[in-house]
């Protein structure tokens, strides 16, 4: 039915929250700062807000990297910490963290035997390839498309157009795009002419304005769509 699969990385193949919590904790430890679990939801909320602004084109990735941790530290009452310096360490620690989503590896193994798999992510190229390799997933992925290399972020049509330009043997209709984000993945995939599969493990409601082709709650449901 489909000749290829595009698949998101963070929160589709790798558990971003678990990886980010590990990286945040390591960053605090190297500074001799006490880390408490209730700090992570503050980061998660602020980080999500920054990424939503990136997806809508309101800010650049450079602005996120410059401002993200200063905003987090201000909210946590830790203004003495250097946000840009913490950003450098956080990204390094995140690159070393690869907590898989349940059943992600076995699903990739099944899918890769049927058609080419392409990762499509807004994460940095080396970071995402390193994390996928550490999780044992990279051998099953034909190519990793990242916004860093392409120069455009999902859900921008420019991101997907650049991917398609490197795959002349495929049309958008040949591709199933799998991801957890309704905006970056589903809306972006729909607007680019691909069939879409929303990975929705929390069974969240789907807004009327976005209509994925499929909705799954467990990655083990994915092979039956091919």
PLM regions with names:
Residues 1-5, 18, 105, 109, ...:
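Asp-based, Mg2+/Mn2+-dependent phosphohydrolase catalytic module
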Residues 2-102:
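N-terminal helical cap/lid subdomain that shapes the substrate entry/recognition surface
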Residues 26-31, 107-115:
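A short, Lys/Arg-enriched amphipathic alpha-helix followed by its capping loop at the start of a domain
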Residues 28, 47, 112, 167-168:
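Residue-level detector of secondary-structure transition/capping positions
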Residues 32, 77, 114-115, 136, ...:
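Glycine-centered loop/turn motif at secondary-structure junctions
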Residues 60, 98, 119, 176-177:
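Residue-level marker of alpha-helix boundaries and capping positions
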Residues 68, 73, 89-92, 116-119, ...:
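N-terminal start-of-chain detector that recognizes signal peptides
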């Amino acid at each position: 039915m489909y000749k290829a699969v595009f698949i998101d990385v963070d929160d589709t193949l790798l558990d971003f929250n678990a990886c980010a919590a590990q990286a945040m904790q390591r960053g605090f430890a190297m500074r001799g700062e006490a880390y408490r679990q209730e700090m992570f939801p503050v980061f998660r909320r602020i980080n999500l807000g920054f990424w939503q602004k990136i997806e809508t084109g309101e800010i650049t990735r450079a602005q996120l990297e410059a401002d993200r941790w200063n905003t987090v530290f201000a909210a946590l009452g830790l203004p003495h910490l250097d946000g840009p310096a913490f950003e450098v360490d956080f990204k390094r620690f995140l690159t070393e963290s690869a907590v898989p989503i349940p059943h992600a590896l076995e699903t990739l193994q099944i899918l890769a035997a049927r058609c080419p798999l392409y990762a499509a992510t807004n994460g940095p190229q080396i970071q995402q390839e390193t994390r996928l390799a550490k999780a044992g997933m990279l051998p099953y992925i034909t190519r990793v498309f990242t916004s860093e290399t392409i120069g455009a972020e999902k859900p921008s049509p420019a991101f997907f157009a650049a991917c398609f330009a490197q795959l002349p043997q495929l049309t958008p209709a040949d591709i199933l795009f799998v991801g957890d984000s309704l905006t970056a993945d589903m809306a972006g995939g729909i607007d680019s002419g691909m069939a879409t599969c929303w990975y929705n493990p929390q069974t969240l409601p789907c807004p009327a304005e976005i209509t994925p082709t499929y909705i799954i709650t467990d990655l083990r449901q994915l092979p039956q769509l091919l």
